[in-house]
Amino acid sequence: MCSPTTENNNNNNDHLVQSSDPNHPANLIPALCAKFWTLGWVTGTGGGASIRSDDLVYLAPSGVQKELMKPDDIYVLSLAAQAQSLDKRQRVYLRSPANYKPSQCTPLFLAAFTKRNAGCCIHTHSHWAVLVTLILETQGAGKDREFMINNIEQIKGFGKGFGKSGNLGYHDTLKIPVIENTAHEEDLTEFLEEAMDKYPDTYAVLVRRHGVYVWGENVHKAKTMCESLDYLFQLAVEMKQLGLPWVTDIEPTVPTRK
């Protein structure tokens, strides 16, 4: 694993994570992760979140108990400086915390920011997400590469795709690609980017036996889509237990107006 470089070691740019604004990324990330911990999404230091503010990217560190995270624990890097780096695997951090290591999720978060112009990316270890990938695994090769569900109201919580206006409708089919897990998280990057290319309209990628990455134009959209996905994953697991299909052919109901 590549070690990070940090600019301006004299003062470590601590001002980048100091703000009284509750909506500042350095304050939002700990608040979000504390909430996600109560949902079981970031148990045992797993998972994480990152927020982009123009050129600056704020990242939760590795190994931190997410419910106890503080603004001082946040890493900050510059997308422009990262783009100019000769070694793309080498991180150029503007600000680094004293007691933690950079998250191996970092290159995956950066993929969401650079390939989808996302403003926020969330990674959870939701057990519902993991269960869905295990259920898909039983479908056999060729049928385990995407999660699909339709005719469920919560699908309306997802946008139609990158650069498109509006949200999916009740009868639309939501498709989430599944990639295989790797021993080291950063090695997922290439597979995540391939899934983004193959599914240009997706806002999420499932990682088999691991969890899910979800991104959005801003924190609000990333968070609400992550919540909607977790709802759908739980619903899908329970539907499977009842023998109910995830994809159905239902004729639209049209009201009769007099």
UniProtKB/Swiss-Prot annotation:
Residues 1-21 are annotated as: Disordered. Belongs to the aldolase class II family. MtnB subfamily. It holds the Pfam family Aldolase_II. The active site is at residue 153. Its cofactor is Zn(2+). It is found in: Cytoplasm. Keywords: Amino-acid biosynthesis, Cytoplasm, Lyase, Metal-binding, Methionine biosynthesis, Zinc. GO terms for cellular component: cytoplasm. NCBIfam families: salvage_mtnB (TIGR03328). Catalyzes the dehydration of methylthioribulose-1-phosphate (MTRu-1-P) into 2,3-diketo-5-methylthiopentyl-1-phosphate (DK-MTP-1-P). The gene is mde-1. SUPFAM superfamilies: AraD/HMP-PK domain-like. Disulfide bonds: none annotated. Binds 1 zinc ion per subunit. HAMAP family: Salvage_MtnB_euk. Substrate binds at residue 105. Pathway: Amino-acid biosynthesis; L-methionine biosynthesis via salvage pathway; L-methionine from S-methyl-5-thio-alpha-D-ribose 1-phosphate: step 2/6. GO terms for biological process: L-methionine salvage from methylthioadenosine. GO terms for molecular function: methylthioribulose 1-phosphate dehydratase activity; zinc ion binding. Zn(2+) binds at residues 123, 125, 210. This is Methylthioribulose-1-phosphate dehydratase. Its EC number is 4.2.1.109. InterPro entries: Aldolase_II/adducin_N, Aldolase_II/adducin_N_sf, MethylthioRu-1-P_deHdtase_MtnB, Salvage_MtnB_euk. It catalyses: 5-(methylsulfanyl)-D-ribulose 1-phosphate = 5-methylsulfanyl-2,3-dioxopentyl phosphate + H2O.
